[in-house]
Amino acid sequence: MNRFIHLFLILYLSFPVFSSTNSVLIGDLTKDELFLKNQKFYKNYLSAEPYQLNEAPDIDGISVKILFGTWCHDSQREIPKLLKLLESIGMQSEMISLIGLNYSKNEPLNRGEIFEIRRTPTIIFYKNAIEIGRIEETPKLMLEGVGFVPVSMEENLLFILNS
C-alpha cells in the first residue's frame, strides 16, 4: 500500500512538469522560462541560423517589448529567431520584455489591450522610452505604391533602428 501511495504521489507531482513543456504561457517571462516551459521555442532557437549583419545598429537607449502567444505558429517561428538576432547585436536581456498572451491576445495586466495588439507576435521597439516602430506577425516593410512587402527579420530590424 505504501508503494502505491508513493508511486501515485510521484506520478501526480510529476504530471504538471511533463504536461507543461508546450503550455500556454501568460504574463512576464524570461527567455530561460520560455525555453524551459515550451520546447518548440527552444528547438527553434537552437536551429536558428546566426545572423551576420553588414552594419551594426546603434542600440543605445533601445528597448524591446515582445508580446506573443506560445500557441501561435508565427510566434513560435519568429520569436526564437528574433531573440538570437537581438543577442547577436549585443542587446542585453534586461532591455527585452517577453509578455505571453492568451488566445484572446491579452493577459492579466491587460497589456494586450493597452498596446493594441491585433496580431501575434507584436514586437515594439522603443528609443529612450518612445515607440519607434513595430513588427506585427511577420517581418515586412511598407513600400510606397506597392504595399507591404515581406522582408527578413534583420532587414526589418535595421529599418526600424536606423530610421
Where are these regions (language model features)?
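Thiol-based oxidoreductase modules, predominantly thioredoxin-like and allied folds used
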Residues: L67-T70, S93-E107
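Conserved helix-turn-beta segment immediately C-terminal to the redox Cys motif
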Residues: D58-S63, K81-I99
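Sec-dependent N-terminal signal peptides
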Residues: F4-F15
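N-terminal leader/targeting and pre-domain segments
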Residues: S20-I59
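Stable alpha-helical elements in mature extracytoplasmic
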Residues: E78-K81, M153
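Non-catalytic, surface beta->alpha helical segment in thiol-disulfide oxidoreductase systems
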Residues: F125-S163
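Thioredoxin-like thiol-disulfide oxidoreductase module
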Residues: I99-T120, F125, T138
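Conserved redox-active cysteine motifs that mediate thiol-disulfide chemistry
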Residues: G69-E78
